[in-house]
């Protein structure tokens, strides 16, 4: 049985398997669009912010 999924970027249906090297995306273009959205912080993993992981402000700056 062939599993079909929709590309998360353009919603094109594709077969999940070795013939789809960019899965879950349909193409390199859709893969790069998604990567760009993460890099531009348009996407993020929801959850509480851990203050220990935040950088300290430079001297004289205020926390936002």
UniProtKB/Swiss-Prot annotation:
GO biological process: regulation of DNA-templated transcription
One Pfam family, short name: YacG
Cofactors (names): Zn(2+)
Residues that hold Zn(2+) according to the record: 7, 10, 26, 30
Keyword Signal (UniProt): no
Residue ranges, annotated region (Disordered): 43-64
UniProt GO MF annotations: DNA topoisomerase type II (double strand cut, ATP-hydrolyzing) inhibitor activity; zinc ion binding
Keyword Zinc: yes
Organism domain of life: Bacteria
Keywords from the named record: Metal-binding, Zinc
CC cofactor note: Binds 1 zinc ion.
Subunit field text: Interacts with GyrB.
Free-text function comment from the UniProt entry: Inhibits all the catalytic activities of DNA gyrase by preventing its interaction with DNA. Acts by binding directly to the C-terminal domain of GyrB, which probably disrupts DNA binding by the gyrase.
Family: Belongs to the DNA gyrase inhibitor YacG family.
Protein name (Swiss-Prot/TrEMBL): DNA gyrase inhibitor YacG
Species whose genome carries this gene: Aeromonas salmonicida (strain A449)
Lineage, broadest ranks: Bacteria, Pseudomonadati, Pseudomonadota, Gammaproteobacteria, Aeromonadales
Gene: yacG
